[in-house]
Structure formats: structure tokens, C-alpha cells
Amino acid sequence: MFKRGVKIEIIPAIDILGGRCVRLFQGDYAQETVYSSDPVGTAMRWQSLGAPRLHVVDLDGAADGQSVNFELIKEIANSALIPVEVGGGIRSMETVKKLLVAGVDRVILGTAAVENPELVKEICARYADSVAVSIDARNGKVATRGWVTNTEIDALELARSMKKLGIRRFIYTDISRDGTLSEPNFAAIRDLISAINVPVIASGGVSSLSHLRLLKDIGAEGAIVGKAIYTGDLNLKRAFEDLS
């Protein structure tokens, strides 16, 4: 059984679009802010501050349905001394293998979980400890294909079905909070943790130490921090010292 509330893993996000490190507002590709033209250097910066893991998203891949920034991701994975998890455009067994062979520690499935559950089952059978499913939701309903396509699939229903297929870890993102510096959807995250009783990583709107403390208290295994560490709203080093 998953043990809750002991500590929380704080995971810096590196979102890559056009080879640059960017942040989007609520997942909108038309509302991007470029923070660095050197994603590898950014990864090394977060590692030097004490990051236990890096969360890398291939935004081009998420939109195109295939890995676009593979060479850059490979360079990050090979340069980092900490585990690197990757999402965005991972919709085939071939892409999963390619990323894991390249040194990626964990692959994250999003669209594939909705559109190809048989593939998820096959991936779990071979790489159960190296895969997570990202539940990306608007008003409790799952969005796919780079968050552009809305569905009527309930987030909790998807999580339950993926757990039955062998998924042992989930990432939950409330799209309306992502990139807003508001706050996470604590209620939805709490409900998901209670419903599936496996590790859940929270994402979207995490922007303060108090957010991280509350996420730890409700049982989140980890929290992905994005815009707040780029704007300076969240002091990453202090967060690691206080909560890791």
C-alpha cells in the first residue's frame, strides 16, 4: 500500500518548444513565454540547486504525436546525474524503447492512455516501473493531443481503468491552473489519491511553499513546479531544504 505524507518529491519542469525552454499559459501554445534557449543548461541549473528528478515535456511532440526534440532530451538525460522523466508525443512502443535506451528514467503517457489502452497494457507488461500516466483535465474531463482535444472522459474513470492495466503512478494536471501561479486543484488531487491509492504527482498552479506543504499533507508523492521557479515566485533551493 502507498505510504502517504512522509515527504514530497519536488520536480522542476523543463518544457521544450522549438528547442527552447518555455512556459505556456493554461497549455495554450499561442501564449508562450521563453525562459531559456538552453534547456540542457536549465536542467543543470535545477540539478545544482538540489533537484531529485527532472520533468521534461516535448511540447512539439505532444502536438505532433511523435518525439520531436529527442536529441535534446537525450542530451539532458545523459548530462544529468539525477533521473529524468519525459512526456509529450509518446504514442508507440518504439518511442518508449528509444527514450529508455537513451537514458530516460520514466516515460509519461497521456494521449496514448485514452486512444490506445492496449498499447498501455503492452508497455506496462514490459516497463511497469518506468511508466506513468498523465491525467490532464479541464473541469474534471480529460484533454489529449497537447491538451488541444477535449473529451468527455472523466479523470477518475481514466485513472481507474489505467490502474487495472498495470499503471502504478499518475501525474494529475488541472489545465486551467497550469502556468497561472494560482494554486493546485487540491480537491481533485485528493480525490484521485483516495480513489486509486497509488502514487500521484501533482501539477498545475504549484507556486508556493504552502502549496507544497498541503500537497504533502494530502498524500501527493510529488509536485511538478514550473512557472513559479522561472519567475522566482518559488525559491527552489529553499523548497528542497524545507520539504525534501
UniProtKB/Swiss-Prot annotation:
PANTHER family in the cross-refs: 1-(5-PHOSPHORIBOSYL)-5-[(5-PHOSPHORIBOSYLAMINO)METHYLIDENEAMINO] IMIDAZOLE-4-CARBOXAMIDE ISOMERASE
Listed GO biological process terms: L-histidine biosynthetic process; L-tryptophan biosynthetic process
Principal localisation: cytoplasm
Sorted UniProt keywords: Amino-acid biosynthesis, Cytoplasm, Histidine biosynthesis, Isomerase
Gene Ontology CC annotations of this record: cytoplasm
Protein name: 1-(5-phosphoribosyl)-5-[(5-phosphoribosylamino)methylideneamino] imidazole-4-carboxamide isomerase
Catalysed reaction, written as an equation: 1-(5-phospho-beta-D-ribosyl)-5-[(5-phospho-beta-D-ribosylamino)methylideneamino]imidazole-4-carboxamide = 5-[(5-phospho-1-deoxy-D-ribulos-1-ylimino)methylamino]-1-(5-phospho-beta-D-ribosyl)imidazole-4-carboxamide
Domain of life: Bacteria
GO MF, any single term: 1-(5-phosphoribosyl)-5-[(5-phosphoribosylamino)methylideneamino]imidazole-4-carboxamide isomerase activity
EC nos: 5.3.1.16
Species the sequence originates in: Dehalococcoides mccartyi (strain CBDB1)
Pfam family, one: His_biosynth
Protein location: Cytoplasm
Active site, per annotation: D15 (proton acceptor), D136 (proton donor)
Keyword presence, Iron-sulfur: no
Family under the similarity heading: Belongs to the HisA/HisF family.
Biochemical pathway: Amino-acid biosynthesis; L-histidine biosynthesis; L-histidine from 5-phospho-alpha-D-ribose 1-diphosphate: step 4/9
